Amino acid sequence: MNKFNQRVSVLAVAATFTIFGLPAVAQQYEAAGILKRAANNLGASDLNTLIYSAAGNAWGAGQPYTAGKALPKQNYRITRTIDYVNSALSDDVTRSRAEPRGGTAEPLTGERNLIEAVGGNVAWNVVNMNIAPGNRYVAERVPLIWLNPHGVIKAALKNNATLTFVTEGKKSLGVVSFTEPGRFTAKAYINDAAEVERIEAVVPSPVLGDMPVVTRYSEYRDFGRGVKFPSRIEESTAGQMTLQLVVTDVQPNSGKVAIVVPPAAASFKETVASSKLADGVWMLAGGSHNSLAIEMKDHTVLVEAPLYDARSQAVIDETKKLIPGKPIRFALNTHVHFDHSGGVGTLAAEGATIVTHQSNKAYFDRALSAKRTVSPDALAKSKKKVVVRGVGDKFVHTDGNRSVEMHLMKDAIHNDGLMMVYLPKEKLLIQADMPGPLPAGAKPPAKPNPYLVNYIQNVDRLKLAVDTVAPIHGATHPFAEVKRALGN
């Protein structure tokens, strides 16, 4: 019998007895024992703050080129700062593309740096020294504070964890399970060296519902001050690889930690600024992503349900004020990327049919029928049956007076199911994630942006008579200004 099994043999017997009704309090007591041993080994007990740096690759979760398929690979560097005492986290992240196809906000060439942070129930980014409130990130960032070797020990001790045992190959692992209410569920697998080998968690996703995240830790080293930390980290999200990192530096209990919630982020609320583009057509702006409301004879069409419940609910509320008495019957989705589809469940809860390219239908059918138990959202609470309509490369919806068209952007680099929305009567084009006009006084670049080339080629191929562009990101502008950016 190895040392670990000698130490936990009594615990294993106790765990076996749970089958016959061992009280939950006994399971919690035994879990506390294995957690305290891991805490002593890893230096978690007196660890208040942690800074670590790592580099490797990331894959853009929720940003595939094809719905449900491979995620876009990135080159990735991170310095993560965690404040366990104040439940705060700040990531200084630098990303660049390792391949051109797929989503994410990184440019086709060069790097992008930003800070991604959360403190309590407030999240924000810092881009070029500017604060960008982002409460949609709270649900994904709060778990990051605790779903790491030291954090999971602290969270498990606080949340009355229970203990079971599994054998994997020739290894015996203690499995500590607990729930952080409304945030995540977790299982921490602890080996005979009292190290956290992996954490299996379920976190809430606006698109996927209960989303599994598995993080593996290996090659622990002593980084000083009695703190051990893994040298390698691998993470998968919803069954797809999302991180492979090598840790280069760890600073336990550093005096450099001061994560302060900016006032602009603390006071942020989702608001919608509506503007009339034509009779019965409104731009719904006020955030990072726009939506559009289109009035039909006896119903309303909404273009784009982005981000998460709170944003899309604000859009719904504003739409009802602008177009009273006409239900939102259709929600047109430009593509599957999480930031553009995070509110489709909210619209489905409203009773709208989700309209998307046929290549996305199976993906949305699975996603929107998944359980949503960790943090029940509007869709879960509504208990509505979701209707997803997959359409071909061209789709026309009309009431006899106004027509709304959807067109596939063929050969798009961003996503192969990317749709544009066109209103022929108004000569208005709605597009997502394509470039806009050049800054005032700027000259067209010698090498055109491939996104821009493909965008204009598609408009020309379809022979769309476009006067005005209403982008999902940014302000409306003349299409002539887009063509000027290409030198036309």
Predicted features, each with a name:
Residues 10-21:
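Bacterial N-terminal signal peptides
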Residues 310-355, 461-467:
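Active-site metal-binding motif and surrounding structural segment of the metallo-beta-lactamase
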Residues 242-297:
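Zn-dependent metallo-beta-lactamase
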Residues 456-488:
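Divalent-metal (often Zn2+) His-rich catalytic cores of metallo-beta-lactamase-fold enzymes
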Residues 170-261, 419-424, 431-432, 437-438, ...:
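Gly/Pro-enriched, hydrophobic low-complexity segments
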Residues 275-319, 418-437:
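Conserved beta-strand hairpin/beta-sheet module of binuclear metal-dependent hydrolase folds
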Residues 37-40, 44-131, 159-167, 309:
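N-terminal mature ectodomain segment of secretory-pathway/periplasmic proteins
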